[in-house]
């Protein structure tokens, strides 16, 4: 089962993308594989014009379709998730997240933007028909810091939320995998019994 790490930040480097990478590292430690997609690397004209014929857009949509779970990270600007992420989500089919697990992550300047995930992003994600949207993880700029010497540093409460979110995602993926229908195997005709 593949997990897609979807970075919705228009800039690089980005706190939200670094938080997303950290979640990816935690998932690898639990034995999961992931693919990465940075929306800012897609052609802007194609996204804004909803050009589904663009090769990069087709490949990106295919990556979303093939994933069992999507971890979406975005910065919060003016009490909403990034516009480039919204433009990309608008390209997905009506039920583009069907049967997928979704873990939303966001970073913002202050705690006052914390509800942006629940009031702005979650309804859009829910409209795409995911199997389950896990509890969101929001961190302020002060809670997610970066330096060349020490790399990414998370405040203890955020580190705990990330551990919990990754554990929930991993457990949910395992449950989905166990519940998935197994492939049928051929049965020799001599073993088939029919009654009339």
Where are the regions a protein language model picked out?
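Residue-level recognition of beta-strand->loop/alpha-helix junctions
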Residues: 7, 38, 136-138
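Helix-loop-strand module that forms the ligand-binding subsite of alpha/beta enzymes
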Residues: 52, 56-129
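N-terminal beta1-alpha1 ligand-phosphate binding loop
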Residues: 1-32
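Cofactor-binding loop segments of dinucleotide-utilizing enzymes, especially the Rossmann-like FAD-
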Residues: 8-10, 39, 107-108
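Glycine-rich phosphate/pyrophosphate-binding loop and the adjoining helix
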Residues: 133-196
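N-terminal beta-loop-helix "entrance" segment that forms/cooperates
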Residues: 36-55, 145-149
């Amino acid at each position: 089962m593949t997990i897609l790490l979807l970075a919705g930040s228009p800039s690089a480097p980005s706190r939200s993308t670094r938080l997303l990478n950290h979640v990816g590292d935690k998932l690898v430690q639990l034995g999961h594989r992931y693919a990465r997609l940075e929306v800012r690397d897609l052609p802007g004209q194609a996204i804004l014009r909803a050009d589904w014929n663009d090769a990069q857009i087709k490949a990106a949509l295919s990556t979303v379709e093939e994933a069992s779970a999507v971890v979406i990270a975005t910065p919060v600007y003016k009490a909403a998730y990034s516009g480039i992420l919204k433009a990309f989500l608008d390209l997905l089919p009506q039920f583009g997240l069907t049967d997928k697990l979704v873990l939303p992550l966001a970073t913002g300047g202050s705690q006052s933007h914390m509800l942006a995930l629940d009031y702005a992003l979650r309804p859009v994600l829910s409209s795409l028909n995911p199997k389950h949207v896990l509890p969101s993880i929001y961190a302020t700029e002060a809670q997610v810091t970066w330096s060349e010497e020490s790399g990414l540093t998370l405040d203890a409460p955020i580190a705990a939320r990330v551990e919990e979110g990754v554990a929930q995602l991993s457990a949910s993926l395992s449950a989905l995998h166990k519940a998935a229908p197994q492939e049928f195997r051929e049965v020799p005709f001599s073993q088939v019994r029919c009654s009339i």
